[in-house]
Amino acid sequence: MEVRVANVRKEFERFPALHDVSLDIKSGELIALLGPSGSGKTTLLRLIAGLERPTRGKIFFGDEDASQKSIQERNVGFVFQHYALFRHMTVADNIGFGLKVRHGSSRPPAQEIRRRASELLDLVQLSGLEKRYPAQLSGGQRQRVALARAMAIEPKVLLLDEPFGALDAQVRRELRRWLREIHDRTGHTTVFVTHDQEEALELADRVVVMSQGRIEQVGTADDIYDTPNSPFVYGFIGESSSLPVKVENGEIWLADRPIGLSAPHAPEGEATLYFRPHDVELLDGCSGCIAGTVAASRRVAGTRRVELEIGGERQRVEIELPVGHPAAQKSRVAFRPGRWKLFPAA
Amino acid sequence: MTTAPAQAGWRFRQPSVIPGFGLTLGFSLAYLTLIILIPLSGLIWRSASLGWAEFWAIASDRRTINALEISFGTAFLAAAVNVVFGTLVAWVLVRYRFPGRRIVDAMVDLPFALPTAVAGIALTTLYAPNGWIGKLLMPLGVKVAYTPLGIVVALVFIGLPFVVRTVQPIMEEIDREVEEAAATLGANRFQIITRVLFPGLAPAIITGFSLAFARGVGEYGSVIFIAGNLPYKSEIAPLLIVIRLEEYNYPAATAIAAIMLALSFVMLLVVNLVQTWSRKRYG
């Protein structure tokens, strides 16, 4: 089922949580909503589910306007961060709940509901736990029961709010791979919220980066990482360093020296240069480069991360050096960014 | 830790590393013995001096049986009424924000504080055939004051806060997400309340019921004013005990008291077992 969010605005007591957000989700896609807390990602997810009503704008499921439908009619599967399982029901009863509350002829017979529940338990690899109560399960198992419960109603869309947020790192990684498998097998259109970029980039077909109630960028992991379209995305996704620079005659200047990068299409004047610390070319001499003194140096896994003080302003930037590089305290290092991007100074 | 025996036989479950288990357990036992156990065993001992035949004669006396039936029956009915409306009051107080909510909240506790005799007299005045409410009920043929129905009304008044105050905190802890989850799964409002919310509240409701019930069985002050106290019809067991005392018939008084004690204990024990069972299941 395609989902289209059209110019949605949401205010909570006059405070805007989302400004004019539009998003197209293709059928069968796995989409991540990524952003820091307060960016509106959970609000957007809850609007799609119908747990909140938009102040303005519409949400379409396929060609149908879903914004006027109640939560019950929307037929979405929602998985909550803290699972929200029904404590007084067994695992099987939890999973069958959505079918049991149906009315009249749309309610399958009890036998069928039981069969469906154990089928879903097989799918989430928890066969044999039908009779357990949620209190008797581990966090990862509860999360899987919550997912099975959401899938039992054959939802048009599957929505997950920080699905792995409350689990430890090991279980998270496992469940992540497993969710991808389930998605590939069942083909539900799936939207999940996360603040963990690794999770978003690894798992999703497309990532929606959000900040302060707006969508900053939508794209594949490659798009988002390699060509961020705003300073926020550059800073939020992956490591980045930035320097205040000036653009004159299509050349980039740091203080009073050109650094050997040309930007013929950039507007003249103050700007900020962004680059990845690991994507730099080290130089020996320095005519047209960035040079600085090493202020601090740390060993990070396979590389060495150094902080350089640049120019009279003592601007600090981080770059990565090979472990064997002789740069020690106070020594000078010259480099030029490989892939970089300029954004006009705010 | 000199009080925790480590020898053979059964052992205490190893308490936490925080010291004080021996002291606090010892104090609790001593305190409960002094406050509850000694007075009650005195009661049993006194009634035991009767001998079986005499005890049985008192226990099987029509008047005693009727009084016990009225006491336990009305207390049960009143507790049942309180469970329904007490839960409703708690729901309103927890779920809705309205002007005067704090005042209503405070009002719930009034039956705790008010002298029971005052409550009894006030209720009698209202429900008497010429009282404000009694006057309205009279043409319908409903007589409240001076009947068992009046006893139920008094016990409902006395027992309400027990239900509200036990259910309210548990209701406040209900996770919003659980309701939302049920809604996304297609459950309507009624189904959410009956299938998701109330089963979770059941242990608290049972506790509230047993407290209101226990209070109702023992209630004296408010009931004697409204009950009319007709032997065999609207005479409660506690009153019968007082009557026997006034006749200096101490053995009979203690015998009735011992029967009440035994019945109450059994009922509260059953309620407790139900609680433990449901807690074990739902964790």
Swiss-Prot record, chain A:
EC number: 7.3.2.3
A Pfam family hit: TOBE_3
Primary residence: membrane
InterPro entries named in the record: AAA+_ATPase, ABC_SmlMolc_Importer, ABC_transporter-like_ATP-bd, ABC_transporter-like_CS, Mo/tungstate-bd_C_term_dom, P-loop_NTPase, Sulph_transpt1, TOBE-like
Membrane topology field: Peripheral membrane protein
Subunit structure: The complex is composed of two ATP-binding proteins (CysA), two transmembrane proteins (CysT and CysW) and a solute-binding protein (CysP).
Identification of the protein by name: Sulfate/thiosulfate import ATP-binding protein CysA
Gene: cysA
